[in-house]
Amino acid sequence: RAGDDSRYGFIAIADPQIWAPKEFAKLAAAADDIAATVRSYGGMPFHGICCGDIVSHDHSLYGRYNEVMERTGITFRNAMGNHDMKVYGRSYETSFSKFEQMYGPVYYSFDVGRIHYVVLDDNFFIGRDYFYIGYLEERQMRWLEKDLARVQPGSTVVVCLHIPSTCEEQDRKQFRYDRAGSTMTNHRGLYEILKPYRAHIISGHTHTTFNQPIAP
């Protein structure tokens, strides 16, 4: 119905990880596929998000990525991935400067229809070149508590971030999960904040697809 934002489609992608200009042909094909999917719904509004690793450390490719994603015909928001960090600075606080220059804050929220969306940054650069852990800083935890204070308990909340908060055991075996950079080390704090809501967490990082129930 015209003006009705309670019915819409949502598309999540992750880890396009563009490392060279020649990779954009593959991204264009994926963008065209998204556009075809959107058209197949006969005018239903859509929005999307990329859950990080937009590029593979060459942040000069952000502009071209944005141009190619316009082919989808829908608004795409972005979460930051570990490859989107500047992982050669002196501190965590300097690691997200390139991302913020292009896309704005690394954590934010928005509403579409009756759904509240939250985007977080759980890539924590530890000050040694290319080393990071999955960790949600206290500043974001406190911000999230304030943000959700205006959301009715029992409402649906969708959290988008890059490094998964948890994984199934069978999926752990495919990756280096002995490394603290593979999952969010302090995920219990996030789960506690989300407990009053019908929460769904969407992430990337592992280059595979799985669904992991968290709450009983």
Name each model-derived stretch.
Residues 1-63:
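N-terminal active-site segment of His-dependent metallophosphoesterases
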Residues 172-174:
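Core regions of peptidyl-prolyl cis-trans isomerase
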Residues 51, 151-170:
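Short acidic, glycine-rich surface-loop motifs adjacent to enzyme active sites
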